[in-house]
Amino acid sequence: PGTYRPYDLGEEMGVWVNNSDGTTPAVGKAWPPGDSVFPDYTNPRTVEWWTQMCLEFKDVLDYDGIWIDMNEPSSFLRGQYPGCAVNDINNPPYVPSISDRSLAQKTLCPDSKTYLGAHYNTHSLFGWSQTAATF
């Protein structure tokens, strides 16, 4: 076991968004500067994990609300380690006119796996699914 309970329990429960292999957690860079994994709030196990973490925190600090601002899978990398594979889902024939013409710009690779499928199809559900789990 490590020294950070939310990570350790999340790893044990398998709650992270995974790389395209579907088993290895996607690791990106985020605040504070350093490696980050991303909870897959579409996974029922993640809802259990999130509930447990909120309850444990409430034992420490009796809060009456949670501000879940910036609840998107944000990464300072183009995708995550070791980078996005060269394939059609990561490099579709049409890409909107965005900063570097990459769907992985400041987020996870589109072929990353969530409980509901490819990140390409679930990216916009990330914040919504965290909100649903928090409510």
Segments and roles (model prediction):
Residues 1-135:
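Catalytic-domain carbohydrate-binding cleft regions of carbohydrate-active enzymes
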